[in-house]
């Protein structure tokens, strides 16, 4: 949720160049089971500048198999009459040495009053996002991943973070198998097989992607390599290329 390139660059979409920084402070504390962090920046907003004030805090508590955390980001741009607050609760659960689950729940609250600088654009939006990732490696050969995410229509963390888009749900899965136990008489040193698959759709259920891919590679004792790839994708919609003017079908 924190993307430091937002700082010192001015607000996106307003044609501003680099903005001077008046104040920057970073404090961190690493304890036996609890970590704390604070990050504060104030940009120059004199003479009609579009500088803003940024704050980010981080709290994380760790036990033997569970890590819980919270992050807050807050941005105020007085020239735009804009305030943006994003809160994130996150979790890492290590069920065993072979299995791990990670996840986040995010909430954004954006408030902007209309004024001449922001082209009389008023914003009052709140929304949620979340994702969860499960990984499992039962042995040295097999590795599995499953990933699910949901980003609400009005979720926005771009004031102090980065996201490609909102209004989508995504599913991704991957299974890989590595083999290194070829006999000495074999010309193969190792092989790897990876099956990946995924789908993305808008929150209204319009398909943005549906695909699968299978890769297999061999590494010879001579260090030569051979790889085969196969995959497929279904027809999909593109809801961004028209810039808000409907959906475009892509085969």
Can you annotate each of these PLM segments?
Residues 1-6:
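Acidic glycine/proline-rich low-complexity segments
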Residues 10, 14-90:
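A conserved hydrophobic secondary-structure block that centers on an alpha-helix together
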Residues 19, 40-41, 59, 75, ...:
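Extended aliphatic helical segments
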Residues 20, 106-251:
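Exposed, low-structure sequence patches enriched in small/polar residues
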Residues 24-26, 35-37, 67-70, 88, ...:
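Beta-sheet entry/capping signal
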Residues 25-29, 40, 61, 72, ...:
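Hydrophobic side chains in beta-strands
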Residues 31-33, 61-65, 76, 89, ...:
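Outer-membrane beta-barrel proteins
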Residues 79, 84, 91-94, 98-117, ...:
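Extended, well-ordered alpha-helical scaffold/bundle regions in very large, multi-domain proteins
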